[in-house]
Amino acid sequence: MRVVILGSGVVGVASAYYLARAGHEVTVIDREAGPALETSFANAGQISPGYAAPWAAPGVPLKAVKWMFEKHAPLAIRLDGTRFQLQWMWQMLRNCTPERYAVNKSRMVRLAEYSRDCLQALRADTGIQYEGRTGGTLQLFRTQQQLDGAAKDIAVLREANVPFELLSPAELKNAEPALAAVSHKLTGGLRLPGDETGDCQLFTTRLAALAESLGVKFRYNTPIDGLAIAGGKIAGVQCGSETVRADAYVVALGSYSTNFVANLMKIPVYPLKGYSITAPIVDEAAAPVSTVLDETYKIAITRFDQRIRVGGMAEIVGFDKTLRAARRETLEMCVNDLFPGGGDTSKATFWTGLRPMTPDGTPIVGRTPVSNLFLNTGHGTLGWTMSCGSGQLLADLISGKKPAIQADDLSVHRYLKEVAGQTRPAYA
């Protein structure tokens, strides 16, 4: 079967790899000059199935009000003038109940755990290297309230049989030796030994090369103007004056997926702006050995070979990609507070990207009401974590195979309802 994939981020490239491995003739189209040059370029570098959780959580609405008055707040909101933003925030608010949080987190963990299994198999099969480490992740708590609040996440981890360790301040140094100097600032930590880290952009670039070796064609620097429709199906992709035709089409355009399919269906994928800095290591003993997540500032600090990546925060501001100096200041403050002297933040590169987020946190993977159109988008801050599993799942669906995990609650159909024979958004 001929399959066209729109988007060459980590999710699009993973989809291409698994589809090619299943025997399909795959073409990837992207406007950029190469793979992983937008959202996948400089993310936090974590592969964290155990920390797969929705931003829509109990207590977040009240926290959001408090964060409005804090200098280093992890969340910021600025109205972009669209009705869609207001609808999306309202639906996110509705998902902040304990019941919905539990459902959303459980299915996110399901996909993320499966994706890690797929990644491990990929690594065993191909030997792909991407500055990866398998030292686990460590969530750091600065207050007793944060530590107590982790109970709901631990319950989900237990139910999903995800290994974890609850560490006291004195035990943190066993996972991250450099934290011994700052343990007095912390009340404890939640460590997930099965999580991994690495450079997502490097991973995506090398996975694209593996996909090419399987026959995948990559068409970069190519405009993607729209979908040609005939007889209720997709008849091709309009790329300038050319129409690229296939048997099946996959939209993996991240935050841009919503507008791209708007004439066919409404999907609630909104850009969640994040930031990162990447600093050279200057003192090995003072640097992290794996990755930590600062629960207070929602910032991840990740070790690469000779670099430290610091990433996080969320701004609900539309498609604005302005680099804000105040956000860099927050990232530098966080890493220098926990790992003082480990990296030279004065020489750090500064980046921003738009994560494609759904209001319930779960990505949209699978079939759509259009028989030959598939979606693989909405992974939020967990694009790399979920990429291999999402790609394999999509390849199974397109190939007519039963996926290895439950997939019906991952598709766009959870957001759509039929009204008078037409598809309408259930969230409107």
From Swiss-Prot:
Instruction: Determine the domain of life of the protein's source.
Output: Bacteria
Q: Which reaction does it catalyse?
A: a D-alpha-amino acid + A + H2O = a 2-oxocarboxylate + AH2 + NH4(+)
The family database entries (SUPFAM superfamilies) matched by this protein are listed as:
FAD-linked reductases, C-terminal domain, FAD/NAD(P)-binding domain
Q: Which organism is it from?
A: Burkholderia multivorans (strain ATCC 17616 / 249)
Q: Which family does it belong to?
A: Belongs to the DadA oxidoreductase family.
Provide the gene name from the record. dadA
Q: In which pathway does it act?
A: Amino-acid degradation; D-alanine degradation; NH(3) and pyruvate from D-alanine: step 1/1
Q: What is its EC number?
A: 1.4.99.-
What taxonomic ancestry is recorded? Bacteria, Pseudomonadati, Pseudomonadota, Betaproteobacteria, Burkholderiales
What keyword terms does UniProt attach to this protein? FAD, Flavoprotein, Oxidoreductase
Q: Name one Pfam family in it.
A: DAO
Carries keyword Oxidoreductase?
Answer: yes
Show the PANTHER family listed in the entry.
D-AMINO ACID DEHYDROGENASE, SARCOSINE DEHYDROGENASE-RELATED
Give Gene Ontology CC terms.
cytoplasm; plasma membrane
Q: List residues binding FAD.
A: 3-17
Can you name this protein? D-amino acid dehydrogenase
Q: What does this protein do?
A: Oxidative deamination of D-amino acids.
* Cofactor(s) needed for function: FAD
Name a GO molecular-function annotation.
Answer: D-amino-acid dehydrogenase activity
Q: Which GO terms fall under biological process for this protein?
A: D-alanine catabolic process
